[in-house]
Swiss-Prot record:
Gene Ontology terms, MF aspect: carbohydrate binding
Location(s), subcellular: Membrane
Chief site of localization: membrane
Record gene name: chodl
Record's protein name: Chondrolectin
Organism field: Danio rerio (Zebrafish)
Compositional bias of kind Basic and acidic residues: 197-221
Pfam families: Lectin_C (PF00059)
Claim: Transmembrane is one of the keywords in the record: yes
Length: 296
């Protein structure tokens, strides 16, 4: 859970530090047609910040989306275009993108027949999309999936890698161990579906879709060779919540420490009881005694 919150916080930081026309890590990207889904690419240049498959899945779901499913060749090409446009922007300009594969929402379901004879041959048919999509589109590299202990799927993104026996690795799919650390891509429902869901609710027919960051609606290009125009949506307001949540343990620690200090200070300032001394019991009396037996 904490790892997922750190991911969302990192994405929020990247979005808050970057505003530009290109595709930016942590920013929601939508096409001009509201019937098309939106995407969010989570790219971490620092390898130690990358996450395992199930952490990526949880991060997307907590943000209202799902780990990427790819329905057809057109969507595969669109994701490739987004990755080519990817940049991690800073105040001085875009930084270089290093090698790093991306988790997609395809994983192998281990059934009762996994150990039966011939199960290895049917292994590619055991892969399912985590968002419930029934699409059979696959973009495996030549000798993939290798199956075995590798049950989760990544999209190759290693621009510096040389082509292998099956051709270039870039954007092809590979099965990997689910605990490996990679980048990931989230996918969100089309805007028209979200509007329909809201309008179906009681009192939801007059839905105001205007926001502070209004999207620039553009007509999708008709030329297949032309790069698709993109719309960069504002960062999800829900991500801001996860900036506050991780600070709760720190606030509790400060509160406990403050209480402990106050308790110690009060203990030191408490007056101590002193034993009263009865002056009459002192062996030296201030009033001298008169010896009645002395005669002058």
């Amino acid at each position: 859970m904490r790892a997922t919150l750190r991911i969302l916080c990192a994405l929020t930081f990247l979005v808050s530090c970057s505003r530009g026309a290109r595709v930016v890590s942590g920013q929601t990207v939508c096409q001009g047609n509201p019937e098309h889904p939106c995407y969010k690419i989570a790219y971490f240049k620092d390898v130690s910040s990358r996450v395992a498959f199930w952490e990526a899945l949880q991060a997307c779901e907590m943000d209202g989306g799902s780990l990427l499913s790819i329905e057809n060749t057109a969507e595969q090409k669109h994701i490739e275009h987004l990755l080519r446009e990817l940049s991690v922007s800073s105040s001085t300009g875009p930084a270089s993108i290093t090698d790093g594969d991306f988790w997609i929402g395809l994983t192998r379901e281990e059934g009762d027949n996994a150990q039966e004879p011939g199960a290895f041959a049917s292994c590619p048919n055991l892969y399912r999309w985590t968002d419930g999509s029934v699409s059979l589109f696959r973009n495996w590299y030549a000798d993939e999936p290798s199956c075995g202990g590798e049950a989760c799927v990544v999209m190759y993104h290693q621009p510096t890698a040389l082509a292998g026996p099956g051709g270039p690795y870039l954007y092809q799919w590979n099965d990997d161990r689910c605990n490996m650390k990679h980048n990931f891509i989230c996918k969100y429902e089309p805007e028209s579906h979200l509007v329909k869901v809201q309008s179906d609710r009681p009192g939801g027919h007059d839905v105001d879709l205007s926001t502070e960051d209004k999207e620039d609606r553009r007509t999708p290009p008709t030329d297949e060779d032309e790069s698709p125009r993109l719309i960069i949506a504002g960062p999800s307001s829900m991500l801001l919540i996860y900036v506050i949540i991780p600070t709760i343990p720190l606030l509790l620690l400060i509160l406990v420490a403050s209480g402990t200090c106050c308790f110690q200070m009060l203990s030191k300032s408490k007056p101590r009881t002193k034993t009263s001394v009865n002056q009459s019991t002192l062996w030296i009396s201030k009033t001298p005694k008169i010896d009645s037996g002395m005669e002058v």
